[in-house]
Design a protein with these regions (language model features):
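ER/secretory pathway lumenal C-terminal domains and tails of membrane proteins involved
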Residues: 1-275
């Protein structure tokens, strides 16, 4: 249930890909575990990997479902909106799977944001999902830059996000990386911005939870998972708020406890495994 591809190390060095580990492996390991059959698309991808010799990069869009690229996620290095297939096993301890330099260049210089900063525009669901994807990637990039000690670039990335994906058109929430943005601001010492973004995520989740708590009978019963999700988001938002304003975080924790009590009083159950 494993395929091996012999690696031309010189070709890998010339390819321009990020070296995900200290040494280039002698062979690429592709696990086929869990697959009962290989279809034409799978065989085509394996053939491309075997024949390309790393001269031409092979990418998989970050929005593509796992079922469409076998188990090659073990070999991905993220370069913004695309995952580059590499000969490295990037999910191994100590390996890198995020190319900060290429992602920074993509976000700052190559991506076109299509006028999303213009006030009053209508953003449909499909475009909004892509906005969410872009903001999540920018948040990831900022946190990676901070972890690498490049706070100046991290700040530029956050400014870019605020300019191109403004909150007045794309409100902050948990799904679009709002808390990672807030966390990055906090780590940069910009506590006012961190508080603003974390609070926006909190308010969004609280509004949803308040609405679910107005439901009765089967409608409430069918919404329990959604309630628990919003409670989880509120807990995470309060935690990030604690990095910027401990007093506000304490108030949010108190409010969260009250909301959770309301949920239980309406007959809300804990998820399986948490009881």
């Amino acid at each position: 249930d494993t395929v091996y591809v012999t690696i031309d190390k010189a070709a890998v060095r010339k390819s321009g890909m990020m070296m995900a580990s200290d040494s280039i492996p002698n062979r690429m390991v592709i696990s086929l575990k869990g697959k009962n059959a290989l279809y034409k698309g799978d065989l085509m991808m394996l053939e491309m990997i075997a024949q390309s010799n790393w001269v031409r990069p092979i990418y998989v869009a970050s929005t593509v479902g796992q079922e469409n690229y076998m188990n090659l996620g073990d070999n991905f290095v993220q370069e913004g909106l695309a995952n580059r297939i590499t000969p490295f096993t990037t999910n191994a301890p100590g390996a890198k799977n995020f190319d900060t330099q290429k992602t920074y260049n993509n976000v700052m210089n190559r991506y076109k944001y299509g006028g999303l900063s213009r006030k009053g525009i209508y953003i449909d669901e499909t475009v909004m999902r892509m906005c969410y994807t872009h903001r999540r990637i920018i948040a990831q990039l900022a946190l990676h830059l901070i972890s690498e000690g490049d706070k100046q670039k991290a700040n530029k990335v956050l400014q870019k996000a605020e300019k191109e994906l403004p909150a007045y058109n794309i409100p902050y929430n948990y799904m679009n990386g709002g808390l990672d943005i807030a966390r990055a601001y906090a780590l940069l010492g910009q506590t006012a911005k961190a508080k603003e973004v974390a609070n926006a995520v909190w308010i969004n989740a609280q509004q949803y939870l308040n609405w679910y708590l107005t439901l009765d009978g089967s409608r409430f019963a069918n919404s329990m998972n959604d309630c628990m999700y919003q409670i989880y988001v509120l807990r995470q938002a309060a935690s990030v708020m604690g990095m910027a304003d401990k007093q506000t975080a304490a108030q949010q924790e108190k409010k969260l406890n009250m909301l959770f009590k309301q949920y239980q009083e309406k007959g809300g159950a804990m998820p399986m495994g948490d009881e």
